[in-house]
Amino acid sequence: MFKKIAPKRFLFSLLLITAFIAITLFNLNEADKLFADIQKYISDSLGWLIILLANGFLVFVIYLAFGKHKNLILGGPDAEPEFSNTNWIAMLFSAGLGVGLLFYGVAEPVLHFSSDALHAEGASFSDKANRSMNLAYLHWGFHGWAIYGIVGLCFAYFTYNKNLPFRVSSFFSGPLTKNIWGRVSLDVIAIIATIFGIATSLGLGANQINSGLGYMEVLEESFTSTVGIVIVITLMGLISVVLGLKVGIKILSQMNIIL
């Protein structure tokens, strides 16, 4: 397993993530304010761009599904599906959306509805409800799947059709990827983005589990118990990944769908 680790990419990613976490922990108040300001700036100034890009991804995926590339077989002309449709759907929902959908599927529309900043002054109950659901559908509907689908298709095509390494840098060509440091930089950025994206979903899920167990008086709701839940979930995920798609992730996904 360790032979497949790329030393440069792993070490640079580890150093940057560790440095970021350390700086944040030693400056919690300043970091909290900075993150809030960045989020507000992105929401206020670039919200239109995010929605435009999401729609662009959706249109592009529809084109790929029905355009001239619709008959392209991932893995080569003789490739056969490795999993049934049922198993694929289970893995997509469990590994793709997971606790994020479980937590925000209900919470997000409610949060949008209660936020006065998102609604025109004097908006009716139905207008607020419709706008709240529209935003939730943008995040958890076809648009989200289109974005995930593009990345998944890129990995599948360049890895299994073009026999390139399973890395984000394999998607690109040109001056940026002609030298090793250009390729490493792209992969490090992708690794950091993935880690923090997973951390967000994991944190939300751990908080939800902690809150539920606290409500049922099974476990005291506290920071320590949240950390313990994160560790348990992380270990389960790690074991699942080490066991591979055919055993770990497949079985865990099937259990999630049943639950």
Identify the role of each PLM range.
Residues 12, 46, 53, 186-194, ...:
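Membrane-interface loop-to-helix entry segments
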Residues 78-81, 117-128, 165-183:
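Juxtamembrane inter-helical linkers in multi-pass membrane proteins
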Residues 112-131, 209-227:
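Hydrophobic alpha-helical transmembrane segments and immediately flanking/interface helices
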Residues 106, 110-112, 117, 153, ...:
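Generic secondary-structure boundary signal with a strong preference for alpha-helix termini
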Residues 1-4, 28-42, 61-80, 132-139, ...:
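Membrane-water interface regions at transmembrane-helix termini and the short interhelical loops
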Residues 3-4, 8-11, 15-25, 58-61, ...:
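Helix-loop-helix module between adjacent transmembrane segments
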Residues 1-125:
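N-terminal alpha-helical transmembrane segments of multi-pass membrane transport
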Residues 34-44, 48, 121-148, 172, ...:
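Membrane-core helix-loop-helix motifs of multi-pass transport proteins
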